[in-house]
Amino acid sequence: MIFNKLYGGFTMKKAKTAVALGAFIALGLGAKVEAETVPQTGVNRIHFINTKGSPGTDAILLESNGHYALIDMGEDYDFPDGSNPLYPFRGGITTSNFYAIEDRLFRHLDQVGVPKLDFMLGTHVHSDHIGGADEVLQRYKVDKFYLKRYSDDRITSQGGLWDNLFNYNNALNAAKKYGVNVVQDISDKDSHFKLGDMDIQLYNYKNEYGPDGKLKKVYDDNPNSIVAVVTVNGKKIYLGGDLDNVYGAEDRLGPQIGKVDLMKWN
């Protein structure tokens, strides 16, 4: 996604630098964390997991006063080989292990000392955002998983289908297998919650439907990205997945969100 204008009254800053959150630190890409054996209390940090050779891959760890959550889980190693007609092999599907951050994500979570995740949020169904969801659900206890509904039928561009349904179904099947509460129809009440000291407000979280009662047609799943705005220690951080302005989402949300201190988007 390319952000080609100021987002309402937003202040845009590079996400690749360490940013002070009051007395605490939001870790930048590539920042190292010393191993911890127990969760840290009184600490508020946002970890932007190193994305190696894939600038679009997202996995963001929220850490607040001994509580943890993931926004996106990054690219993993698996992809459809075409043997199942439900998941055809299409051009554009990521097949190179070079782009997978599954091992890196787990290593980082273990170094931090994450015992469980209060929630996971999949911004949208592209593999570089939720490819690793099923692996995370297998490895860690997760209380809640936010993920909007998806269907291949809603994507109008063949070039935007990739392995979306494969990732989506893998994530939901894993959540069901491990008894995780999945929230797919996010209500206004569901959209605002706390993680330790962090106040989290979701935007663009509602499933949109057309006159036929089916999910509204879109060219690609990027416009469906859930936005999370985290406020902690007087600072506001925008985590936007791959949201774009093709259907005017940026114009609509900018005035609602207002000025932020840090933006992270792809």
Residues of each region from the PLM?
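Metallo-beta-lactamase
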Residues: P115-D128
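Conserved residues at the C-terminal ends of beta-strands
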Residues: M120-T123, K148, N266
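Core dinuclear metal-dependent hydrolase active-site scaffold
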Residues: E36-P115, Q184-W265
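A short helix->loop->beta-strand "cap" motif at the edges of active sites that frequently abuts
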Residues: Y140-K144, Y178-V180
